[in-house]
């Protein structure tokens, strides 16, 4: 699978909580039809070369899933997945530099980011790690950290022919202003971009 790059040339970056998923849906929804148009534009721009798949979405939560097939063997694919700094889009970090990202793949470890001036951010908390196979983390990505939600993200890697199939699911439930439906497409588009970048790296 080859994917389109996802630069920040769409007109924004994501180096603060307010822009991690582009402009927060609640802000845009308050602008009525104009805000809805902007929300749609952002989702289309972020989708890039990855196909969005919102499995379900309602007022209580949403579930998204993405799957790619890569030529790498499961152990190599999983190892590259853990090298998150190599493929995570810098436009979707707090610091703007993916070199600050790391995944400590053990229960109690985290997908974390070092911030300037000695700060740090926890993107997700690792609750299950099986080398070469499964990584499960919990938490709210980006501005979802500041909302009354819970989220569970699972990455699974399985043999497929001479390569591997990588599946990522992210399930979020809780309450946010404007309703969960407003967030589903943006989160799905962002995550679709990340797995596409991972697939590109594994295709090289």
Model regions and ranges:
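Glycine-rich portal/gate segments that line the openings of hydrophobic small-molecule binding cavities
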Residues: 86, 90, 96-142, 200-204
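Hydrophobic/aromatic beta-strand elements that line small-molecule binding cavities or substrate pockets
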Residues: 66-68, 122-128, 151-159
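Amphipathic hydrophobic-ligand
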Residues: 60, 147-154
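A conserved amphipathic terminal alpha-helix motif
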Residues: 165, 169-204
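Bacterial N-terminal signal peptides
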Residues: 35-46
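Hydrophobic ligand-binding cavity/cleft-lining segments
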Residues: 49-100
């Amino acid at each position: 699978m080859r994917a389109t790059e996802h630069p920040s040339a769409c007109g924004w970056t994501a180096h603060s909580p307010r822009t991690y998923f582009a402009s927060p849906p609640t802000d845009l929804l308050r602008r009525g039809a104009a805000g809805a148009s902007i929300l749609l534009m952002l989702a289309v721009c972020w989708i890039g070369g990855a196909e969005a798949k919102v499995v379900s979405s309602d007022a209580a939560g949403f579930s998204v899933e993405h799957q790619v097939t890569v030529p790498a063997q499961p152990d190599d694919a999983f190892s590259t997945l853990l090298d998150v700094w190599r493929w995570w889009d810098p436009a979707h970090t707090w610091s703007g530099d993916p070199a600050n990202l790391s995944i400590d793949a053990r229960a109690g470890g985290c997908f974390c980011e070092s911030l300037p001036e000695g700060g740090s951010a926890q993107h997700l908390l690792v609750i299950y790690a099986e080398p070469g196979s499964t990584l499960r983390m919990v938490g709210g990505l980006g501005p979802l950290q500041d909302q009354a939600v819970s989220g569970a993200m699972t990455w699974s890697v399985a043999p497929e022919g001479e390569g591997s199939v990588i599946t990522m699911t992210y399930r979020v439930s809780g309450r946010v202003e404007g309703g969960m439906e407003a967030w589903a497409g943006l989160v799905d588009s962002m995550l679709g971009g990340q797995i596409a970048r991972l697939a590109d790296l594994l295709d090289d």
